[in-house]
Amino acid sequence: MKKLNLMIILGLILTASASAMADDVADIESTMEKHFVTFKAGDAAGHIAHHMAGHSSFGPEGGVLVVIDSLEEETAELQAEFDEGYKFDFQLVDLDVAVYGDTAVVTSLQTGTVTVPDGTTETVKNRRTSVVVRDGSEWKEVHSHISEYVEESTE
């Protein structure tokens, strides 16, 4: 009887844990969707609201790690790009979320267009990896790594 009770308790714990993880995945997917809806809308404050102070990134052009200590400065810099006429229309494709407690790794392809102030539009397809952490009841991005997607050779 004790074994049966123990198995029932373990089953309930595992079920609750799996349910919580599924909720976390859905919450993170929703956060990432909002992150890019605000980017497309030119809403710098809304976009940066999904970052933590100290956010770091490797951009698609390569280069050194960029660390942003001030969310206010990051918001102002992005808003300046929007005000200059830059427009971004990205979608996340093949989104995958792996949750590790209060941290998660989000991978996807980032596809879409960038329009520069002179009206020239460039199609982009990048690989994107984000590290997000739980901040109270929200998930926030602490790091992103974006690199150009290169088609696999068929040779």
Q: Where would I find each of the regions flagged by the language model?
A:
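Short beta-strand edge/turn micro-motifs at domain boundaries
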Residues: 105, 125-150
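Positively charged n-region of N-terminal signal peptides that target proteins for export
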Residues: 1-5
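A solvent-exposed, acidic/Ser-Thr-rich amphipathic alpha-helical stretch
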Residues: 25-26, 30, 44-99, 109, ...
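Short, low-complexity N-terminal intrinsically disordered segments enriched in polar/charged residues
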Residues: 17-50, 153-155
